[in-house]
């Protein structure tokens, strides 16, 4: 488990963009980030799992002649092969879905762009007001900082008393600006929600959505057909491992039974 935790921690701490900074690659897609995370996680599980199996074989497996470590390596090889075979198929599936839903994203973006243009002046005005408030607060606090440096500890209590009402005033004025912005953007939020609802309702009965559903089902069917050979290879690869474990276990039970009968 330590290897798994370490792998996940390293992935999140370094970030998905870290390697692109050094390699100068293009930004990753969502699928690339998911695939990289899954690869790191599976490799970590495989390594930590092998360590655990080795410990188990040392304590128990040798007595029962289970050959756990050999079977684990066989399983790891089988799953690695499955992952490499399904990788291109899965990538193709998501690429096709992304291409087929491009029209849907474009329809949604039309409304978003229109609303963004309308609310931009309010956001800009809000930002300017906040900056003015901060500048006003800074000018009021600056002389107090000078007094503190001159009077040192003696004026610390006095400075705190002066800063408290200034901070409260800044907080109240900021809340006022936020409430004002919320009131200004409220109608646009409602409008956007209504238009999005109307757009989705229209899409339910549209030929485009029906066509997309048909394509999605077709992609799923294609994915299933292409993945079937890889899954069959996995099943065939697991059979010898399971048979080996079964034979070893039965042999061990038979040996133990003979020893007990001889006593």
From Swiss-Prot:
It is found in: Secreted. Keywords: Cholesterol metabolism, Glycoprotein, HDL, Lipid metabolism, Lipid transport, Lipoprotein, Oxidation, Palmitate, Phosphoprotein, Repeat, Secreted, Signal, Steroid metabolism, Sterol metabolism, Transport. Sequence repeats lie at residues 66-87, 88-109, 110-120, 121-142, 143-164, 165-186, 187-206, 207-228, 229-239, 240-263. Residues 66-263 are annotated as: 10 X approximate tandem repeats. GO terms for molecular function: amyloid-beta binding; apolipoprotein A-I receptor binding; chemorepellent activity; cholesterol binding; cholesterol transfer activity; enzyme binding; heat shock protein binding; high-density lipoprotein particle binding. Transmembrane segments: none annotated. Residues 1-18 form the signal peptide. InterPro entries: ApoA_E, Apolipoprotein_A1/A4/E. The modification Methionine sulfoxide is found at residue 108. The keyword Repeat applies. GO terms for cellular component: chylomicron; endocytic vesicle; extracellular vesicle; low-density lipoprotein particle; spherical high-density lipoprotein particle; very-low-density lipoprotein particle. Pfam families: Apolipoprotein. The keyword Protein biosynthesis does not apply. Homodimer. Interacts with APOA1BP and CLU. Component of a sperm activating protein complex (SPAP), consisting of APOA1, an immunoglobulin heavy chain, an immunoglobulin light chain and albumin. Interacts with NDRG1. Interacts with SCGB3A2. Interacts with NAXE and YJEFN3. Participates in the reverse transport of cholesterol from tissues to the liver for excretion by promoting cholesterol efflux from tissues and by acting as a cofactor for the lecithin cholesterol acyltransferase (LCAT). As part of the SPAP complex, activates spermatozoa motility. Belongs to the apolipoprotein A1/A4/E family. This is Apolipoprotein A-I. It comes from Octodon degus (Degu).
């Amino acid at each position: 488990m330590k290897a798994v935790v370490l792998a996940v921690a390293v992935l999140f701490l370094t970030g998905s963009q870290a390697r692109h900074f050094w390699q100068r690659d293009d930004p990753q897609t969502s699928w690339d980030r998911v695939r990289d995370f899954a690869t790191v996680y599976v490799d970590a599980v495989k390594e930590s799992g092998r360590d655990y199996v080795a410990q188990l074989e040392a304590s128990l497996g040798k007595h029962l002649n289970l050959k756990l470590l050999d079977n684990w390596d066989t399983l790891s090889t089988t799953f690695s092969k499955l992952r490499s075979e399904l990788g291109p198929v899965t990538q193709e599936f998501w690429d096709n879905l992304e291409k087929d839903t491009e029209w849907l994203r474009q329809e949604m973006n039309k409304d978003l762009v229109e609303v963004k243009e309308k609310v931009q002046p309010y956001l800009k005005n809000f930002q300017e007001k906040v900056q003015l408030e901060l500048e006003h607060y800074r000018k009021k606090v600056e002389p107090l900082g000078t007094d503190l440096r001159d009077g040192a500890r003696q004026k610390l209590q006095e400075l705190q008393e002066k800063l408290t009402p200034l901070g409260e005033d800044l907080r109240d004025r900021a809340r006022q600006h936020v409430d004002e912005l919320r009131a200004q953007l409220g109608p646009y939020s409602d409008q956007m929600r209504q238009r999005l609802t109307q757009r989705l309702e229209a899409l339910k009965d549209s030929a485009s959505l029906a066509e997309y559903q048909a394509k999605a089902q077709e992609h799923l069917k294609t994915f299933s057909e292409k993945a079937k050979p890889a899954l069959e290879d996995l099943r065939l690869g697991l059979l010898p491992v399971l048979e080996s474990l079964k034979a070893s276990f039965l042999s061990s039970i038979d040996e133990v039974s003979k020893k007990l009968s001889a006593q």
